[in-house]
């Protein structure tokens, strides 16, 4: 559960920081 929460948080942060999805890491590409 902790890992899932951490991954979700990291994904939200990465999506917030990413301006160009082409430059996003594949793991963070599908966010929402």
Curated annotation (Swiss-Prot):
Disulfide bonding pattern of the chain: 15-31, 18-24
Q: Domain of life of the organism in this record?
A: Eukaryota
Q: How is it modified after translation?
A: Contains 2 disulfide bonds.
The GO terms describing molecular function are: sodium channel regulator activity; toxin activity
Q: Name one GO cellular component term.
A: extracellular region
Family that this chain belongs to: Belongs to the scoloptoxin-03 family.
Q: Which residues cross the membrane?
A: none
Q: What is its main location?
A: secreted
Q: What is this protein called?
A: Mu-scoloptoxin(03)-Ssm3a
Q: Which Gene3D superfamilies match?
A: 1.10.60.50
The taxonomy runs: Eukaryota, Metazoa, Ecdysozoa, Arthropoda, Myriapoda
Its keywords, alphabetically, are: Disulfide bond, Ion channel impairing toxin, Neurotoxin, Secreted, Toxin, Voltage-gated sodium channel impairing toxin
Origin species, per record, is Scolopendra mutilans
């Amino acid at each position: 559960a902790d890992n899932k929460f951490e991954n979700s948080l990291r994904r939200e942060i990465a999506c917030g920081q990413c301006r160009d999805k082409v430059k996003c890491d594949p793991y963070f590409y599908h966010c929402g």
